[in-house]
Amino acid sequence: ERTVISNLRPFTLYRIDIHSCNHEAEKLGCSASNFVFARTMPAEGADDIPGPVTWEPRPENSIFLKWPEPENPNGLILMYEIKYGSQVEDQRECVSRQEYRKYGGAKLNRLNPGNYTARIQATSLSGNGSWTEPVFFYVQAKTTYENFIHLIIALPVAVLLIVGGLVIMLYVFHRKRNNSRLGNGVMLFELMRMCWQYNPKMRPSFLEIISSIKDEMEPGFREVSFYYSEENKPPEPEELDLEPENMESVPLDPSASSSSLPLPDRHSGHKAENGPGPGVLVLRASFDERQPYAHMNGGRKNER
C-alpha cells in the first residue's frame, strides 16, 4: 500500500503515524500506531526574497534597508546576508532572523559619502537562496552647518582638556620640586648633625653653611645679609659689682684706684680664705681678662 500526502512545507521534518482499522473500528477501535519520520524535499526558489529591497536614509552616515521574507522557505530561515560597497561589493554583514523580525530590516553604519549598491541573500536549513537585484542608494556628505556645530562643540572641549593637562603638569612639577627641596634639607640636616656630634673641630661656620646652600636659595633670599645680627653684637662692658655702702670710697679714676689700693700683706692669703673683710673693695675682672670658651662654630665667643 502507498499514498501521497500533499500540501506539505518544503524541507520540513514530519512524523507520520499509521493505524490499521476495519468495519469493527467503531466498536473495537483501530490497532496500535506505527510511526515514521520523514523530511520533505527542498523546493527550488523557496528561499528567494520575493519583493524588492528598499532603503531609507538615516543620520550619522547610515541607511536602513528593508525587504520582505520568503513566504514558504525550505524549513526555517536562519539569517540574511547583505553584500554592499561603493564601487565593488566587498563588504558583508550578517543579520539574524530575530534581529530582522525585531526591526523589520537592517541598518548599515559608518558609511562614507558616495553612491552604493547592495544585494541580500536568505539562508535557510536547506541552504542559501538567490541574491536579490542590486539596490542603489547614496550617502550625503555632512553640510557646512553640521561641521560648524561640531567644531563649536569640540573646540571648548579641546581647550578644557589642554588647560586641565597643563594644570596637572604644573601641579606635578611643583610637587616634585618641593619634594626635592625637602630631601635636600633633610640630607643637609643629617650631615650637620653628624658633624656636630662626631667631630666638633670640623663644625662649619654660619657663613660656610650659607655659602654651601646659596645655589638652592631663591634669588631674593640671596640678597639678605647675614654678616650682622643681634647675636653677633660685641658684649656690653660689664659694670662693677659694688656694694651700696662702699660707693663713696670708689675713685672715679681707674689709675687712681689702682694706686690707692693697699698692697696685700702676708695675711692676705688668710683673709682671702675667710672672705673679704669690711671696708675692702672687690673688683671683678674685666671682659678681656676672662677665660675664653669655645663657640659652637669653632671660634671664641668673647674674641673681638
UniProtKB/Swiss-Prot annotation:
The keyword Repressor is assigned to this record: no
Pfam families: fn3
InterPro entries, A to Z: Ephrin_rcpt_TKs, FN3_dom, FN3_sf, Ig-like_fold, Kinase-like_dom_sf
Extracellular membrane side: 1-147
Enzyme Commission (EC) number: 2.7.10.1
Post-translational modification Phosphoserine, affected residues: 225, 229
Domain of life: Eukaryota
Domain called Fibronectin type-III: residue spans: 1-43, 49-142
Functional note: Receptor tyrosine kinase which mediates actions of insulin-like growth factor 1 (IGF1). Binds IGF1 with high affinity and IGF2 and insulin (INS) with a lower affinity. The activated IGF1R is involved in cell growth and survival control. IGF1R is crucial for tumor transformation and survival of malignant cell. Ligand binding activates the receptor kinase, leading to receptor autophosphorylation, and tyrosines phosphorylation of multiple substrates, that function as signaling adapter proteins including, the insulin-receptor substrates (IRS1/2), Shc and 14-3-3 proteins.
Protein name: Insulin-like growth factor 1 receptor
